[in-house]
């Protein structure tokens, strides 16, 4: 009887160890899957539950840093432009707008080439989020945002609109991006000290000189 009890106890201990090992294996496999998703990330979706700065890669460009946001419009968005303090000048030349500039903890622009690659990797939605200093929030959503390649001037395409402001960016649809050193025949970029998709010098221009009444963000999903 004592022998049987001893064997039974050993059996139960072995089963307990196996169960713990299985649990550890499950945790390990989950961590491996998570790391694989992170390593192969081409958007902010894998980082939906932990927003911050991560490296992603899309076809045509090397790995690059993106700011992933999950607060403004839901989880998994890529911030492509941020104006939160007016510390960075947006009156930049074509090459700088192509590559991107600024700091992701302050004002920045991701870069036209990266935005082109991202927006053409699959269908993307653009969300424009504006916050007045009194806390009032305004937004605009475009359900099929993309820009063309550099040879075609990074021309703008928006898709359908929804928001609690007017469809102010529509005037820029199908237009090429303009900077003070490229395409600025009407001197709009020079006058407003910023690159943008100008039709005339009166535009919805989210790269214009920073005003103290709003902070704003452009994000892609």
Stretches found by the model and what they are:
Residues 95-221:
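Beta-rich ligand-binding surfaces for carbohydrates and other polyanions
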Residues 1-74, 135:
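Assembly "stalks" and propeptides
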Residues 35-36, 52, 75-80, 195-199, ...:
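Extracellular/mature segments of secreted proteins
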Residues 51, 63-65, 74-77, 123-125, ...:
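Short, surface-exposed beta-edge/turn micro-motifs
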Residues 64-99:
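Calcium-regulated, polybasic anionic-phospholipid
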Residues 59-60, 82-85, 130-135:
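Short, flexible beta-strand-to-coil junctions
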């Amino acid at each position: 009887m004592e022998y049987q009890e001893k064997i039974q106890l050993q059996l139960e201990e072995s089963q307990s160890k196996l169960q713990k090992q299985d649990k550890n294996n499950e945790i390990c496999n989950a961590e491996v899957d998570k790391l694989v998703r992170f390593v192969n990330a081409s958007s902010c979706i894998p980082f939906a539950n932990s927003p911050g700065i991560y490296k992603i890669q899309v076809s045509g460009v090397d790995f690059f840093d993106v700011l992933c946001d999950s607060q403004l419009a839901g989880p998994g968005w890529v911030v492509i432009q941020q104006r939160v303090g007016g510390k960075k000048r947006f009156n930049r030349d074509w090459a700088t707008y192509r590559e991107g500039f600024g700091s992701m903890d302050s004002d920045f622009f991701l870069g036209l080439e990266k935005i082109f690659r991202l927006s053409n990797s699959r269908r993307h939605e653009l969300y424009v989020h504006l916050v007045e200093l009194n806390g009032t929030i305004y937004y605009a959503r475009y359900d099929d945002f993309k820009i063309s390649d550099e040879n075609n001037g990074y021309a703008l395409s928006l898709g359908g609109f929804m928001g609690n402001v007017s469809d102010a960016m529509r005037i820029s649809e199908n237009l090429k991006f303009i900077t003070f050193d490229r395409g600025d025949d009407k001197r709009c970029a020079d006058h407003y000290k910023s690159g943008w998709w100008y039709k005339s010098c009166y535009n919805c221009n989210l790269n214009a000189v920073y005003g103290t009444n709003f902070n704003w963000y452009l994000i892609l999903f």
